[in-house]
Curated annotation (Swiss-Prot):
GO cellular component terms, A-Z: cytoplasm
Organism per entry: Rhodococcus opacus (strain B4)
Keyword Cytoplasm (UniProt): yes
SUPFAM superfamilies reported in the protein's UniProt record: Class II aaRS and biotin synthetases, tRNA-binding arm
EC number in record: 6.1.1.11
Keyword terms of this UniProt record: Aminoacyl-tRNA synthetase, ATP-binding, Cytoplasm, Ligase, Nucleotide-binding, Protein biosynthesis
Pathway(s) served: Aminoacyl-tRNA biosynthesis; selenocysteinyl-tRNA(Sec) biosynthesis; L-seryl-tRNA(Sec) from L-serine and tRNA(Sec): step 1/1
Compartment(s) where it occurs, according to its Swiss-Prot or TrEMBL record: Cytoplasm
Record-given protein name: Serine--tRNA ligase
Xref: Pfam families: Seryl_tRNA_N, tRNA-synt_2b
PANTHER family: SERYL-TRNA SYNTHETASE
Family: Belongs to the class-II aminoacyl-tRNA synthetase family. Type-1 seryl-tRNA synthetase subfamily.
Length: 418
């Protein structure tokens, strides 16, 4: 949730953020109204309780003759207090609903617009110039015994797959390398739960406009996570952290689940867009004033991992209309996919400022010992989709695929052969 104090002092900035996202700026006025109503309800309730307390003293000091009338007045006042408390609860509920309807405030400098309005910050590496007709990742995966979509569909349905043989080793090796790099950079490795409570899913901002993307186990009222960002954000919910020595960094290795409800007909071939995949995700808690620098560090660590798999990629500054509700700024790294003649997302790193931590009650103590809301950030370090870029960019004319040097010790071979 956004900071209500900031909203009261800078309503136009929040309206502009809504416009940058392509969302309704009128929601800002609705929140301001709900905030004013709740504050008025609190004041009215406080005044009535003060009056009730003073009246109680008066009753205690009254003569026997005066007391019956005063007691009657006390009952009337108690009824008014009860009514005021009900109004206060109602006003708080209305405020909470209006508050949750507003997305995080987009950072200055982020481009406005939608999915296609990103800004390319840098392009890295040479696009391969094949002297043969390249195969796509699925054709390579099937011919080399790495990917089995047919049996995945037989067992689980569309957008499921088996990684087999060296395909499984390629993923495990990639994730293991990511884990090693994360630990070398000061992250604590975590294997988190992949089922979370509704308040944790809501706290991270995933139960908003895109909640239909999430698998829900209704009988247990638990949600399957689409990223380990969710349980890692909930890890310190309701806590006050010690950030005196710098950010707290965690790297979560988990299976992730997405319904892809809004992706009918998109990327139906292969493993680019699937219901289940594995990922190593970086997650950071830090002081708000350190968040921008931490965001750049997360991006640098992602780029270091991309350098290890040796694929051409570009870095983009994602437009406001393509940000998730929790993100104030997001940078994506997109790898070149030769058979699509396009760049496709491999990593994403988001600065969520204090938005998630405010919902989840994650705080730290400032230099005066006063609790303040922390900032949270996240970033992809490796995921199943990377196999697409590795296979397509490192394929050879004889149908084999060269394994990136950094992955050879994990995979157990330097060339993937039929």
């Amino acid at each position: 949730m956004i900071d209500l104090k900031f909203l009261r002092e800078n309503p136009d900035a929040v309206r502009e953020s809504q416009r940058t996202r392509g969302e309704d700026p009128a929601l800002v006025d609705a929140l301001l109204e709900a905030d004013a109503s709740r504050r008025a309800a609190v004041l009215a309730g406080d005044n009535l309780r003060a009056e009730q307390k003073a009246f109680g003293k008066k009753v205690g000091q009254a003569s026997p003759e005066e007391r019956p009338a005063l007691l009657e007045g006390s009952k009337e006042l108690a009824a008014k207090v009860k009514q005021a408390e009900a109004g206060q609860h109602e006003a708080q509920a209305a405020l909470d609903a209006a508050h949750r309807a507003i997305s995080n405030i987009v950072q200055d400098g982020a481009p406005a617009g939608g999915e296609d309005d990103f800004i390319t910050l840098e392009t890295v590496g040479e696009i391969p110039a094949f002297d043969f007709e390249p195969k796509d990742h699925l054709e390579l995966g099937e011919s080399l015994g790495l990917i089995d979509m047919e049996r995945g569909a037989k067992v689980s349905g569309a957008r499921f797959y088996f990684l087999t043989g060296f395909g499984a080793m390629l993923q495990l090796g990639m994730l293991q390398l990511a884990a090693q790099k994360a630990m070398a950079n000061g992250f604590q490795m975590m294997i988190p739960p992949v089922l979370v409570r509704p308040e944790i899913m809501a706290g991270t901002g995933f139960l908003g406009a895109h909640s239909d993307e999430i698998y829900h186990l209704a009988d247990d009222d638990l949600y399957l996570v689409g990223t380990s960002e969710v349980p890692l954000a909930g890890y310190h919910s309701g806590e006050i952290l010690d950030l005196a020595d710098g950010p707290k960094r965690y790297a979560g290795w988990s299976t992730c689940f997405r319904r892809e409800a809004g992706s009918y007909g998109k990327d139906t071939r292969g493993i680019i867009r699937v219901h289940q995949f594995d990922k190593v995700e970086m997650f950071t808690y830090c002081k708000p004033e350190d968040a921008d620098a931490e965001h750049q560090r997360l991006l640098a660590w992602e780029r270091d991992m991309l350098a290890a798999i040796d694929v051409p990629y570009r870095v983009i500054d994602v437009a406001g209309g393509d940000l998730g509700s929790s993100a104030a700024r997001k940078f994506d790294c997109e790898a070149w996919v030769p058979t699509q003649q396009a760049y496709r997302e491999l990593t994403s790193t988001s600065n969520c400022t204090t938005f998630q931590a405010r919902r989840l009650g994650v705080r730290y103590r400032d230099e005066n010992g006063k609790p303040q809301t922390a900032a949270t950030l996240n970033g992809t370090l490796a995921t199943t989709r990377w196999i697409v870029a590795i296979l397509e960019n490192h394929q050879q004319s004889d149908g084999t695929v060269r394994v990136p040097e950094a992955l050879v010790p994990f995979v157990g071979t330097d060339v993937l052969k039929p």
